[in-house]
Amino acid sequence: MERPIFQPVGTPVEELDTPALVLDLDVMDRNIQVFQGYFADTAIKARPVVTSHLCPQIARRQLDADGTNGGIAVTTLGEAEVFANAGFADILLANEIVTVSKIRRLCALADQTSVGIAVDNPDNAQQLSSGATEAGVELRVLIEIEAGMGRCGISLGAGAIELAQKVNGLPGLKLEGIMGSVPGPRGDDYSDHQDRTLDNLQVIVEAKLSIERSGVAVPVVSVGGTHCYSQALQVPGVTEVRAGRYPLMDYRLKAFLPELNPAAKILASVISHPVDAMAVLDAGHKATAPDQGRPVLEGIEGGSATRFSAEHGIVDLEGDAQELLNAGDKAWLVPYELGASVNQYDY
């Protein structure tokens, strides 16, 4: 697979070499307008998470539209450095950074732009304070609260209060608030998503209230992600929603958020049609990243992408679909999970 594939501007989509990740700008811009429009007239604002698309030009389009707080969120230090070099002035690294080398890089970055960082334990807070003090910079800190994700975050209770008090008193750190992420829908079952999400969001808000009762201000309550925006708008105390998937969208969330449409799709070529009931595409595991779910074949009724090896994608065909995909034809695949699929491409 050739990555990146360079084609002159104006090349018809059908003439692109494959596999290729293709972005429909009209659909993407419409997704941005629809999603961020929900925040335009509210005190709660969106903070775009750029980890899914990793593209400064797309992030600019997001910040140029209504409804954001003017900042972005990233998941890795490398992402933060790329977007800082692209001129972004408010970056939240919504993850923990613990190694000495990365803390040095983080502090160097804070000398260039305003950087926020997640913390969920006092030892890490002390590390960050020492690094920031040595570098002569200030790091914005958000205490990460565990709210159902089962990964990073300190549980609601005395530990969270003590951590906030510690951060609030450490040199080189500015306690900006708290953050948390809540789980998305369970597969295709959305029946309990509303209640579960509201409960999980309330855990984060209760952490804010508990910390404030101890005498420490919590001006920012940042929650994530795209799937929880409508519930977050109902919860007093939330100040921002970190959301990443909405500009490009994927099949995983499409049924749950029908107001948004997939803007990024994979163009593949049929390289073989060895038997009536099967066609073979040149988009395999390396092009589609089907780890969390198989991409969906678009526009071919009776056809479905069923299995993938490194460089081959197998499409099962039934009925009239057996006549539709012959060697040399093109096919469209909608990624099931956006971030992993986009990560396969250089652009």
Locations of regions flagged by a protein language model:
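C-terminal accessory subdomain/extension
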Residues: P274-Y347
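Active-site loop/helix belt of alpha/beta enzymes
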Residues: R140, E146-P258
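N-terminal glycine-rich anion-binding loops that anchor highly charged ligand groups
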Residues: P4-P8, V27-I58, T75
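Active-site-proximal beta-alpha core segment in soluble small-molecule metabolic enzymes
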Residues: V49-R186
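Active-site loop ensemble at the mouth of alpha/beta enzyme cores that anchors a bound cofactor
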Residues: H227-E301
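Generic N-terminal amphipathic, Lys/Arg-enriched alpha-helix
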Residues: P4-L23
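Conserved, mostly hydrophobic/aromatic
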Residues: M28, T51, F83, I143, ...
